[in-house]
Amino acid sequence: MSVPLILTLLAGAATFIGAFLGVLGQKPSNRMLAFSLGFAAGIMLLISLMEMLPAALDTEGMSPVLGYGMFIIGLLGYFGLDRLLPHAHPQDLVQKRQQPLPGSIKRTAILLTLGISLHNFPEGIATFVTASSNLELGFGIALAVALHNIPEGLAVAGPVYAATGSKRTAIFWAGISGMAEILGGVLAWLILGSLVSPIVMAAIMAAVAGIMVALSVDELMPLAKEIDPNNNPSYGVLCGMSIMGLSLVILQTIGIG
């Protein structure tokens, strides 16, 4: 099994960590969840804008028009799907968790699971494509994806467990979203394995960079602010950027990058 596929599997499996936290009652503080989301956004922004997009543009034979065009397609594609596909957000469950409406909570959790699955699927593809092009960047993307999968698993499993009383059901529904990400990675492994053209991989990587930027600014940062409105998510973003940037420098210095 290839390393990029393993990274994708591990990133998707992080959803189960949140699911177990949701059913065991050991919920992390809102401040910690918000910081982790900001941290993940910082990693994604730095890698997308400072590494993935420049690497795609520097590929031999890649024109700036195609490179930036694919980046914009990734941006607009994410925003378009996010607006067209009705889905709930994790904060919806956080707000409804205190309401004595178990059936309503369960329905919302199921809708949330389906919505998260829809955007986790391309994340699995993005993780695999990035790791296939540059293993160093793949580690960073996998870490960022895993960090924001944990609160997603928690947001689904906790309310479902409260509504049904079944830990197995709660973990099942939370795990579906993680499995969607793994499925995306597996399909990318099966389909993209035959696409050996560097230009094709560079174009896909530019589009993935656009998706990651959109995900960071439209999903992760606003969600971090809603979970913990008393603290600025920018601290987590800056911390994620700084640590990721430092790690990239260290890896390149020792010859791994």
Swiss-Prot record:
GO terms for molecular function: metal ion binding; zinc ion transmembrane transporter activity. Keywords: Cell inner membrane, Cell membrane, Ion transport, Iron, Membrane, Metal-binding, Transmembrane, Transmembrane helix, Transport, Zinc, Zinc transport. The keyword Oxidoreductase does not apply. Disulfide bonds: none annotated. The chain crosses the membrane at residues 5-25, 33-53, 61-81, 109-129, 137-157, 171-191, 195-215, 236-256. It catalyses: Zn(2+)(in) = Zn(2+)(out). The keyword Iron applies. Pfam families: Zip. Its main location: membrane. GO terms for cellular component: plasma membrane. It is found in: Cell inner membrane. It is a multi-pass membrane protein. Fe(2+) binds at N120, E123, N149, E152, E181. Zn(2+) binds at E123, H148, E152. It comes from the Bacteria. PANTHER family: ZINC TRANSPORTER ZUPT (PTHR11040:SF205), ZINC/IRON TRANSPORTER (PTHR11040). Mediates zinc uptake. May also transport other divalent cations. Belongs to the ZIP transporter (TC 2.A.5) family. ZupT subfamily. This is Zinc transporter ZupT. It comes from Salmonella paratyphi A (strain AKU_12601).
